[in-house]
Amino acid sequence: MNQSSLLAEFGEPITRVENALQALREGRGVLLLDDEDRENEGDIIYSVEHLTNAQMALMIRECSGIVCLCLTDEQANQLELPPMVVDNNSANQTAFTVTIEAKVGVTTGVSAADRVTTIKTAANPTAKPTDLARPGHVFPLRARKGGVLARRGHTEGTVDLMQMAGLQSAGVLCEVTNPDGTMAKAPEIVAFGKMHNMPVLTIEDMVMYRTEFDLKLA
């Protein structure tokens, strides 16, 4: 079955986006699938301002463990986060910066609580580069300007969702994995969403929504 058939029970594309935005406003997570001909993988996404230790623990337990903080260009520049590598030749051009850790309020930086502290420190509107140590256990990602209309990636989808929901622009994502360590595809993502009461939507849904309502985001 393709994504459209699998996601039909979550409503039409516009409904799926609106349900996801409401869930984020309520402090719940959502599951975002990218295109079937891209990765066809699903990420858990949470807003930074509502992020809890329990939510972080779920991401560490059920996902790849590579917890990423999605930032706008402006936020990444404010923190003076350089690219992880000078020459990014990864297949999907994922814009990793150097990894980070909060300088205050953490121990080893690995625990759920420590990662939440690092993320909230970095996403604070008044954050300074000196608030963070490098390297660390949180992986910032720099979203491309134009969001999903410019790049159909989970990074851009995360930042777009936060802005569309009227929340702080920064969001957190982690790729969902199966119990055997393989990557969760659409059927497993749908089952995961039902189990954890998380709306499921796609990058394509977001592109349609932004185009339909002519949404201009930062």
Swiss-Prot record:
MF terms in GO: 3,4-dihydroxy-2-butanone-4-phosphate synthase activity; magnesium ion binding; manganese ion binding
Pathway(s) it belongs to: Cofactor biosynthesis; riboflavin biosynthesis; 2-hydroxy-3-oxobutyl phosphate from D-ribulose 5-phosphate: step 1/1
E.C. number: 4.1.99.12
Reported cofactor(s): Mg(2+); Mn(2+)
Binding residue positions for D-ribulose 5-phosphate: 38-39, 43, 151-155, 175
Keyword field contains Transcription regulation: no
GO BP terms, alphabetized: riboflavin biosynthetic process
Taxonomy, superkingdom: Bacteria
NCBIfam families with a match to the protein in the record: ribB (TIGR00506)
Family indicated by similarity: Belongs to the DHBP synthase family.
Assembly information from the UniProt record: Homodimer.
UniProt protein name: 3,4-dihydroxy-2-butanone 4-phosphate synthase
